[in-house]
Regions:
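Hydrophobic faces of well-ordered beta-strands that scaffold small-molecule active sites
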Residues: 63-67, 91-95, 121-126, 156-158, ...
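Active-site gating/metal-coordination segments in enzymes
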Residues: 29-31, 50, 105-225
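Bacterial N-terminal signal peptides
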Residues: 5-13
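Active-site gating loops and adjacent loop-to-helix segments of metal-dependent hydrolytic enzymes
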Residues: 26-41, 59, 203-229, 280, ...
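Acidic (Asp/Glu)-rich catalytic clusters
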Residues: 52-57, 80-88, 107-121, 143-153, ...
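An N-terminally biased module of ancient metal coordination in phosphate/nucleic-acid-related enzymes
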Residues: 20-116
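H/E-rich (His + Asp/Glu) clusters that bind or coordinate divalent metals
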Residues: 73-74, 81, 230, 235-244, ...
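Acidic-and-aromatic substrate-binding clefts and catalytic sites of carbohydrate-active enzymes
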Residues: 69-77, 96-106, 130-139, 166, ...
């Protein structure tokens, strides 16, 4: 019986081989097998059929705590306000109050706001490393911040230039935790204004430019963003310098821009927030990281709902739609708006209303002074 079964199996095998001869490829198929396509070009539309709920207006009025309006001193704010109204943006925080460092720029920006839309804008000030080697630099820094706040500034924005590009008179890199800058952080704590600080860039900018780099396309498109251990310093070192000032100045409130480049490791970010109760984070330019891990991100927002602010960074009204869709809907598998930032698809977090309210405006009202609360529901 065993031999009979083996004979039948062998006969079936040979019959199947004869019945299914090797098919020759057609010329068209042969050509297809030799085709190549670069990564930038390959971008097929999804064939997945699922509910789509694009959102062009936030569910609740929101405060964008990370925005740059370099033309604020002379611009017609009515055009900007009309765009804000379409998005349901109640307040825009212009982090570039001094523009490229000019006190007159800050004064005229505040004058334009106060004379036209005093309840729709908040302006932050900025500092410079000019004269950092000269006696009295720290005192002058503190005096400038105090004067700017009296003028109408409600926070201090630190660009990534500190840690990446600022140098002293000898050409040495100025570290974020340089003691000569301590007066600035201390003065902000004394005045009750937050410091929104951007340190470094995504860690992938320091990694080899090869097939294993998730930011390969961005670096190819923007090669000037490539960094190294000596250009200007290791990523981890720069980030640690930032964390050092958080710990050194517990009476100062800091907003760690772009989630401190830890949105791709929310367990690490959670530990960071646990260790630094004076630190908040904002979601500018990292929504794609949250959108590809909806369950993990949902748990994070549940646990740290009082520590996260809404921020966008680059101002383009249509790009806000993606933020709203990630935060408010349960949509599946939809694209980010810049492939070179994120080539993957995202999923909606479908955050509950109470968390959305905290993210959109309640936390910012708590952290940033002098925002008019009357434009928000509760």
């Amino acid at each position: 019986m065993r031999h009979l079964s083996l004979l039948l199996l062998t006969s079936f095998f040979f019959w199947n081989c004869e019945a299914q001869p090797n098919r020759q490829l057609t010329p068209e198929q042969e050509k297809m097998s030799e085709a190549t396509m670069d990564f930038e070009t390959y971008n097929p539309p999804s064939s997945l059929v699922v509910p789509e709920n694009p959102v062009k207006r936030a569910k609740f009025p929101f405060i964008d705590v990370h925005n740059h309006q370099f033309r604020m001193p002379e611009m017609d704010l009515s055009t900007l306000v009309a765009e804000m109204d379409e998005l349901n943006m109640q307040v825009l925080v212009n982090l570039s109050g001094r523009g490229r460092g000019d006190e007159a720029h800050l004064r005229n920006a505040i004058k334009n706001v106060n004379g036209n839309y005093p309840n729709r804008f908040i302006v932050f000030t900025n500092i410079s490393s000019d004269g950092i080697d000269e006696p009295g630099y720290s005192e002058k820094l503190a005096q400038q911040i105090e004067a700017d706040v009296k003028m109408g500034a409600n926070g201090l924005k630190i660009y990534k230039s500190l840690g990446l590009r600022w140098t002293d008179s000898k050409g040495n890199r100025i570290a974020i935790d340089d003691p000569r800058l301590d007066a600035a952080w201390a003065k902000c704590g004394e005045l009750g204004i937050p410091v929104l600080i951007h340190a470094a860039d995504p860690k992938q900018f320091w990694e080899p430019f090869d097939e294993d780099n998730e930011r390969w396309l961005e670096l190819k498109t923007r090669p000037g963003r490539k960094r190294s251990e000596t250009n200007p310093a290791p990523f981890d070192q720069i980030i640690q310098e930032q964390h050092n000032i958080f710990k050194r100045h517990r009476n100062t409130t800091f907003i760690n821009a772009h989630m401190g480049w830890m949105a791709n490791d929310l367990a690490k970010l959670s530990k960071h927030l646990d260790e630094n109760p004076n630190v908040y984070v904002e979601i500018g330019a990292i929504i794609a990281e949250l959108g590809r891990q909806p369950r993990m991100a949902n748990k994070f927002f549940e646990q740290y709902q009082d520590r996260v602010l809404f921020g966008k960074d680059a101002y383009n009204p249509e790009e806000y739609y993606t933020y709203f869709r990630v935060l408010e809907t349960a949509d599946e598998y939809f694209p980010y708006y810049k492939k070179y930032h994120a080539f993957w698809r995202m999923y909606g977090l479908n955050l509950p209303d109470e968390i959305l309210k905290k993210l959109y405006y309640k936390n910012a009202l708590k952290v940033i002074p002098n925002i008019d609360p009357s434009g928000f529901p509760d």
